[in-house]
């Protein structure tokens, strides 16, 4: 047995104790895996190709950072923001990541707290759940331009599939132009009047906004070893067309199905979708090739990535002709992401491009490109597995269009029923072994 991380050799007693503990742990896991293997079909072990996290930290919620959008969030000065986020798995310890990735000046956080949200519809926390967060033991931290920082771990009981309130006090003048944001939250966040309300049970006279800012991840140490599945995608992953505040994006619904089926064996499923995102060109947020390392590989506990990208590369050629790309270019970009994921030991799952006939962005040429890309995704044999969103969402009588019952109205994005159909179509056993050690 190899030991590392010690400045001096372990004595014989310590080595013997460690070896004995390791044998007991191995036996326990062997029994658990053996029992679950009896319950699963032969296809399930594909998920075991991915790596297992060594740090113990797993992301339970994420949002992909974007540069500020004028007018989306007002300029802030001596105010507190309270962000409501929905967990996927639970844990006994918690830490957060704050991002100044697109900031134009150092960002001072004067106070930071986490609590259980009383309701996603109001800026009130459950009494007795508030916990102050620190950074190197200090309540305040200045985040350099372009940097991402972690809070100190705190003992905090996180329940799966619940809402947390993360409150950040910004004592200095913080213009909108320097805020790192996530445009499309589908969840209200709250801005206080003047003052530090980070630890307050409720906000007086709050202003609600539908986006997130500064917070890019909430991470936990689960009671049972598990890992993270990252959904990388565009507006269909970001949840456009679903109902605000209900957490009806397909990654949310997949996470709920996994937890309800496997409980603490379930991995987390975190959402790194960006509305309008493309593979090869920026539009809202960095292109997927540029953000893959930050938004996938850097996530705590990542072991699997689901790639739902490419439709905007096809569709936006109608409105941005000079950025038109071919199916071959899209396939090349997807192949790059697959290779980069595999190089880091991740299981990589592909998603077919859904129907979009009848939409503002539709063209016959775009449909030809979509079909060619889907042919590659289904039959290229580069992905470890494929989720066929196209087959789930299309109208059998007109396969280039969304099934009317699943159409949010724009003929591109599903509604709540469509997102539920996507989640229900996914074979959960593909993901079970991400919740077990190898």
Positions of predicted regions on the chain:
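N-terminal secretory signal peptides that target proteins for export/translocation
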Residues: 1-25
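N-terminal secretory targeting modules
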Residues: 5, 34-35, 46-232, 242-244, ...
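Bacterial N-terminal signal peptides
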Residues: 30-42
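Alpha-helical scaffolding within the catalytic cores
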Residues: 80, 213, 251-258, 284-300, ...
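Structural recognition of the beta-strand scaffold that forms the well-ordered cores
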Residues: 95, 228-233, 237, 267-273, ...
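Catalytic nucleophile-elbow at a beta strand-turn-alpha helix junction centered on a G-D-S/GDSL motif
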Residues: 226-251, 275-278
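Oxyanion-hole/transition-state-stabilizing segment in secreted/luminal serine hydrolases
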Residues: 242, 274-329
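Catalytic His-Asp segment of secreted/periplasmic serine-dependent ester chemistry enzymes
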Residues: 289, 315, 354-438
